[in-house]
């Protein structure tokens, strides 16, 4: 059966029953039909139980198809519950654009999925819509201000705030707005990005309360004035209205796995130009309600795990207790250009980063495919053992929670035996430039960093505005540990080039652009939209 057929055949429990497993009452949730709910934020204040343990699922450098982080995340939480450990997953909401583009649906796979799959992949509870409208309200107010006399003196050539839509549409990357005379606004160049790339999305995921959300929105930089002054959303006095649009979106969403175990799905920031993790609030809520929370970070350990630790955990006051590195034979052979042994060097770098840079206990999860041979599995296991890394053959795609029992046992053992004290990778008091250099040299293995001339002006602004104590959000290719997608495996002898710096002051970080990162994807020649359908009974097919 396909993933969607497996999901549709699942026996789902009413969301009230899932909430009860977490100790929640009907008054604690707002139901969106029978199988979805939002959880009220006061649950965090009312619940006094100690926090559970936080498990991060990351991966080796992925192939375009992905290596199954979400599947392993869901399978691991199913396995923990099967062992009698109260556990929940905390993951991101998929973006509509990739659903209709190349990727198709995204809610795990096989017998390690989250349901209702169709709802999660389409409109879900409306959070993406709310984030898009909130973002575009700012856009509308910027152009209205310019058309109404431009009292702030906004330099229309230096507006950095784009518009958003939750769709892959390359035709919107570069546009001209305000055509047709003065009644239609001031003509200028503009562009769209996909909604998950919005700073509003990052802010929603990094806010601990409505009050903090509003303050972060107020601090968003949308451009500069003709005199070089930073223009912020607070200058338009609209932060209250923008936050009001997000009053429901800020509440975490509760759903379930195929095995009726709880899952929080909330937020979905881009793993490149943002931090690529689900919301702080959903993670904190899961930690407060369960003994073990399994979460994931976008792309590989060089990108997602670093930002999870240095951005999400730092801003949310979170402490991970263990990391799982997902590896596949397919991806390792890809990095070795067909040679599995050579490709293991990629895994080696990620193990080193997790153990020695992030200082976390770890387990390598080999996400098993039916084409994998015993010889290949044995080679990976031997490699991990030689490096002092626990390893587990993970079969959650085929067997659900049962296929993740060994992984769950080894994760619990790693947590119980951990003697190291968690700390962030870099000192927040380093300058932005020093943080970038530390990440590039130590996490990526670069010989050095080249800063393009365009970055000098931004560094000057960072210094003048006192922004050096913000964390750094690295934006680079996910296809390589380096900034060059062609360098596979464990690259050496390279330098990272930082082409540009972007100020995400509202979210609370500075984005370092290494290479050309597209924030508005396009559809492939044959998009997934061509195979998605709905019958007369409302049954959807082709999502995955």
From Swiss-Prot:
Enzyme Commission identifier(s): 6.3.4.3
Protein origin, superkingdom: Bacteria
GO molecular function, one term: ATP binding
Keywords: ATP-binding, Ligase, Nucleotide-binding, One-carbon metabolism
Gene3D superfamilies, per database record: Domain 2, N(10)-formyltetrahydrofolate synthetase, Formyltetrahydrofolate synthetase, domain 3, P-loop containing nucleotide triphosphate hydrolases
Pathway connected to this protein: One-carbon metabolism; tetrahydrofolate interconversion
Catalytic activity from the UniProt record: (6S)-5,6,7,8-tetrahydrofolate + formate + ATP = (6R)-10-formyltetrahydrofolate + ADP + phosphate
GO biological process, one term: tetrahydrofolate interconversion
Keyword Methyltransferase: no
Binding of ATP, residues: 63-70
InterPro entries reported in the protein's UniProt record: Formate_THF_ligase, Formate_THF_ligase_CS, P-loop_NTPase
Nucleotide-binding found in the keyword field: yes
Annotated family: Belongs to the formate--tetrahydrofolate ligase family.
HAMAP family listed in its UniProt record: FTHFS
Protein's recorded name: Formate--tetrahydrofolate ligase
Gene: fhs
């Amino acid at each position: 059966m396909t993933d969607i057929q497996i999901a549709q055949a699942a026996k789902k429990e009413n969301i009230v029953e899932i909430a009860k497993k977490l100790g929640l009452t009907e008054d604690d949730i707002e139901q969106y039909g029978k199988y979805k709910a939002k959880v009220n934020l006061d649950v965090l204040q009312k619940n006094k139980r100690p926090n559970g343990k936080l498990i991060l699922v990351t991966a080796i450098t992925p192939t375009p198809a992905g290596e199954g982080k979400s599947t392993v995340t869901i399978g691991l939480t199913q396995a923990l519950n099967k062992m009698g450990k109260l556990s929940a997953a905390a993951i991101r909401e998929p973006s509509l654009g990739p659903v209709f583009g190349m990727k198709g649906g995204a809610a795990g796979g096989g017998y390690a999925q989250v349901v209702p799959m169709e709802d999660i992949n389409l409109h879900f509870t409306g959070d993406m819509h709310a984030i898009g409208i909130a973002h575009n309200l700012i856009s509308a107010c910027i152009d209205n201000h310019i058309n109404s006399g431009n009292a702030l003196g906004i330099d229309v050539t230096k507006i950095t705030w784009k518009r958003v839509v939750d769709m892959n549409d390359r035709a919107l990357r570069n546009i001209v707005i305000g055509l047709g005379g003065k009644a239609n606004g001031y003509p200028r160049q503009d562009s769209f990005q996909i909604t998950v790339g919005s700073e509003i999305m990052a802010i929603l995921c990094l806010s601990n309360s409505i009050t903090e959300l509003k303050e972060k929105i107020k601090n968003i930089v949308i451009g500069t004035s003709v005199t070089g002054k930073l223009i912020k959303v607070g200058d338009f006095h609209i932060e209250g209205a923008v936050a009001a649009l997000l009053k429901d979106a800020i509440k975490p969403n509760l759903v379930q796995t195929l095995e009726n175990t709880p899952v929080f799905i909330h937020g979905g920031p881009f793993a490149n130009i943002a931090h690529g993790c689900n919301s702080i609030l959903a993670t904190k809520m899961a930690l407060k309600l369960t003994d073990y929370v399994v979460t994931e970070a976008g792309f590989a350990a060089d990108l997602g795990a670093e930002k999870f630790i240095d951005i999400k955990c730092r801003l949310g006051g979170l402490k991970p207790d263990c990391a799982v590195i997902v590896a596949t034979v397919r991806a390792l052979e890809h990095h070795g250009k067909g040679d599995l042994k050579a490709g293991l060097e990629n895994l080696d770098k990620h193990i080193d980063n997790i153990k020695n840079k992030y200082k976390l206990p770890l387990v390598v999860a080999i996400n098993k495919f039916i084409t994998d041979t015993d010889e290949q599995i044995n080679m990976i296991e031997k490699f991990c053992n030689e490096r002092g890394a626990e390893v587990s053959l993970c079969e959650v795609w085929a067997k659900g929670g049962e296929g993740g029992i060994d992984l769950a046992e080894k994760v619990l053992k790693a947590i119980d035996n951990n003697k190291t004290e968690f700390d962030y990778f870099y000192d927040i008091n380093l300058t932005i430039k020093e943080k970038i250099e530390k990440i590039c040299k130590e996490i990526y293995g670069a010989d050095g960093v080249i800063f393009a001339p365009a970055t000098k002006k931004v560094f000057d602004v960072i210094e003048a505005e006192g922004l050096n104590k913000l964390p750094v959000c690295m934006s680079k290719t996910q296809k390589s540990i380096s900034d060059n997608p062609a360098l596979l495996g464990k690259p050496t002898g390279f330098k990272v080039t930082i082409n540009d710096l972007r100020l995400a002051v509202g979210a609370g970080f500075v984005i370092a652009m290494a290479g050309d990162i597209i924030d508005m994807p396009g559809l492939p020649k044959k998009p997934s939209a061509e195979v998605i359908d709905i019958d007369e009974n409302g049954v959807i097919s082709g999502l995955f």
